[in-house]
């Protein structure tokens, strides 16, 4: 899947972008640098937190093919009841082959499965052109088995785009097949 989507990017998107925007070099075309998938532990009960973390690690492994990094607290914050080295969340950074495989799956399978998803809004882009999608339930992922007894656990998908400005990042997203409002 990576080779197909990567080859599609190289053979179709880059030449079309160069033609449409009067660019001369392929290096002037915006490119996706990485995809970060993260989940906060949040309201997990302290008695069930180990089980919650283990299930989250398994879900991330199935979803991305990579073991997630555990994000820990750097210091103690009494007001939030956070202890030093307490696990606050999980994250996976995808690059290369796994990034393109996940991007293909995200655009063509996951986004169409989300109820009431109409497209990317302007507020989802930051000032550098990166996009963040909140996915509110793991039931949108086809690889993960549906279990009605398990609470909905969402995650965030951040796509890091190297572009000169936001309009170039939006153009790349449109060429890739993201629905833009």
Swiss-Prot record:
Keyword Magnesium: no
Major localization class: plastid
GO biological process, one term: translation
Location relative to the cell: Plastid
GO molecular function annotations of the record: rRNA binding; structural constituent of ribosome
Gene3D superfamilies listed in its UniProt record: 3.30.1440.10
One protein family per Pfam: Ribosomal_L5_C
InterPro entries cross-referenced by the UniProt entry: Ribosomal_uL5, Ribosomal_uL5_bac-type, Ribosomal_uL5_C, Ribosomal_uL5_dom_sf, Ribosomal_uL5_N
Family label: Belongs to the universal ribosomal protein uL5 family.
Subunit structure as annotated in this protein's UniProt entry: Part of the 50S ribosomal subunit; contacts the 5S rRNA.
Annotated protein name in UniProt: Large ribosomal subunit protein uL5c
Name of the gene this protein is made from: rpl5
């Amino acid at each position: 899947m990576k080779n197909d989507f990567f080859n599609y990017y190289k053979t179709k998107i880059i030449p079309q972008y160069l033609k449409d925007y009067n660019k001369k070099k392929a290096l002037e075309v915006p490119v996706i640098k990485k995809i970060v998938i993260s989940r906060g532990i949040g309201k997990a009960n302290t008695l069930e937190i180990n089980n919650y973390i283990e299930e989250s690690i398994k879900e991330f492994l199935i979803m991305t093919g990579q073991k997630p990094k555990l994000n820990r607290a750097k210091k103690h914050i009494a007001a939030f009841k956070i202890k030093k080295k307490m696990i606050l969340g999980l994250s996976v950074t995808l690059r290369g082959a796994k990034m393109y495989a996940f991007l293909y799956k995200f655009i063509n399978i996951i986004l169409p499965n989300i109820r009431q998803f109409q497209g990317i809004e302007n507020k989802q882009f930051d000032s550098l052109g990166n996009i963040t999608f909140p996915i509110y339930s793991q039931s949108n992922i086809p690889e993960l088995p549906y279990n009605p007894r398990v609470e909905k656990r969402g995650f965030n998908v951040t796509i890091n785009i190297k572009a000169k400005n936001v309009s170039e990042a939006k153009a790349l997203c449109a060429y890739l097949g993201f629905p833009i409002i």
